[in-house]
Design a protein with these regions (language model features):
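Solvent-exposed interaction patches of small proteins and small membrane subunits
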Residues: 1-136
Length: 136
């Protein structure tokens, strides 16, 4: 590929974007208190959110350093660290940071991922996907 974006990296970026959308949907309409109450109030949503964030952490940890360097506004290390927090079951101390991460930091991550996917598409000369005609 002329863009230098390997297929696995592209897949990881697309997965980050999809899983981030899920995580945002899980917390839609919740304020800081609502997010902090999730472990007791809605364990299913809390576990789904935890799993989504751990998945994002794993995916972020696999991204190449040069890609991460292009987006210094993203706390790549912090996102990658979420996989470790979840894998060791120590998510409790992170609860106070959860709402700010979801409200402020996740949109920054998604914007960087979206920009990188667009950049790779532009380098390949493939702008955004075009709709297929019905007669194909």
């Amino acid at each position: 590929m002329s863009s230098g974006l390997a297929g696995s990296t592209r897949a990881d970026l697309e997965s980050i974007r999809a899983v981030a959308g899920d995580a945002l949907a899980f917390t839609a309409g919740l304020d800081e208190g609502g997010v902090a109450a999730l472990p007791q109030a809605d364990r299913r949503t809390f576990r789904a959110l935890k799993n989504a964030l751990a998945e994002i952490g794993e995916l972020v940890s696999r991204l190449p350093p040069d890609l991460r360097a292009r987006y210094p506004e993203v706390d790549w290390r912090g996102w990658a660290g979420l996989r470790d927090v979840d894998s060791f079951g120590r998510f409790g101390p992170e609860l106070p940071r959860l709402h700010p991460a979801m409200a402020e930091e996740l949109p920054v991550l998604v914007a960087a991922v979206t920009a990188e996917l667009a950049r790779a598409g532009a380098e390949r000369g493939n702008g955004p996907a075009q709709p297929q005609s019905p007669d194909r």
